[in-house]
Amino acid sequence: MDLLEKKNIKKGGEVEEEVARKGEERKEEEVVVEEKSHQQQQQQGEEELVGLSLAGGRPKVFPMSSPPPNPSQLTIFYGGSVCVYDSVPPEKAQAIMLIAAAAAAAASATKSNAAIAVKPPVMPAANATQAAVSPVLTRSLSLQSTSVATGQPQVAADPSSICKLQADLPIARRHSLQRFLEKRRDRLVSKAPYPTKSSEGMEASGMEVTAEGKAQ
């Protein structure tokens, strides 16, 4: 019994020593951790002071780690579809934009030229009215179309001659009427043995027409 008690006492003492030793190790580890944290705090304070001095008294944030740069992408919308290209330098993207702008400008210029070429000629209102009112011009145009159909050489209409013909139309009509009345009067005179009232009236009307023609 004495031996067992001695062994137990010895084991108990060893256990107590082991516990005490582990407690001391833990204390030492805690002291080391505290010292490290204190050193880190001091280092951070020094860095903040240096940052303030460099920024002119303003606080400056130092990033711990910079994120990786995103690769440059080019997105193109064309024909209702979306195309995305990776790793496109800015110079190449600018060149593509210049080429697209030049192509768009050329397409718009082509459309405008085509619209101008297709536009029908507009006839002025004054010329249209003159063509509708003047029968002489209509007759000359019909003569020109007939000459084209038959293969004859065309003769250009002179505006001064057209105006002269328009002015001479009433005089020509009066002269033809005068000649007709004179012939009719001569026929009646030759047939009748003596002058009648109707012939006298016709002579008077013929004299009036002659007087009007001379006055003009």
From Swiss-Prot:
Coiled-coil boundaries: none
A GO-annotated cellular component: nucleus
Tissue occurrence: Expressed in roots, stems, leaves, spikelets and seeds.
Keywords: Jasmonic acid signaling pathway, Nucleus, Transcription, Transcription regulation, Ubl conjugation
Major localization class: nucleus
PTM entry text: Ubiquitinated. Increase in jasmonoyl isoleucine (JA-Ile) levels mediates its degradation via COI1B-mediated proteasome pathway.
Biological processes per GO annotation: floral meristem determinacy; floral organ formation; regulation of defense response; regulation of jasmonic acid mediated signaling pathway; response to wounding
Motif (Jas): 170-194
A Pfam family it matches: tify
Compositionally biased tracts (Basic and acidic residues): 1-38
Induction details: By abscisic acid (ABA), wounding, and drought and salt stresses. Induced by jasmonate (JA). Negatively regulated by the SCF(COI1) E3 ubiquitin ligase-proteasome pathway during JA signaling.
Heme keyword on record: no
Subcellular locations according to the entry: Nucleus
Domain notes: The jas domain (170-194) is required for interaction with COI1.
Summary of subunit composition and partner proteins: Interacts with COI1B in a coronatine-dependent manner. Coronatine is an analog of jasmonoyl isoleucine (JA-Ile). Interacts with MYC2.
Protein name: Protein TIFY 3
